[in-house]
Amino acid sequence: MSSPEMVVAECLKAFPEVERVILFGSRARGDAGFRADIDIAVECPTADILRWSDIEEAVELAPTLLNIDLVRLDTAPPELRTAIRHEGRVLYERAERSPAG
């Protein structure tokens, strides 16, 4: 059986715009309680607002009973991006990442 965070990562892999999925917060640190929410950062710089909405909807429909906090990494505040880079654990990274624009 997959962990709840891997279930979410699997949902996100279906979107070609998703370049990286990063777990952060208490689950990444290893100090989460049984019912702790899942904090997920998504790197998807090419996704427009409609596609981001599709991504959010897919995560809402993920087969888990836990709350999921989804953050778009490219629009997150700098302090949060720094924290995610420091404590985050990459769950998925697309093999072919799009070139920087």
Where does each model-flagged region fall?
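Short, well-ordered beta-strand segments
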Residues: 39-41
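Catalytic core of pol beta-like nucleotidyltransferases
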Residues: 1-20, 28-34, 43-101
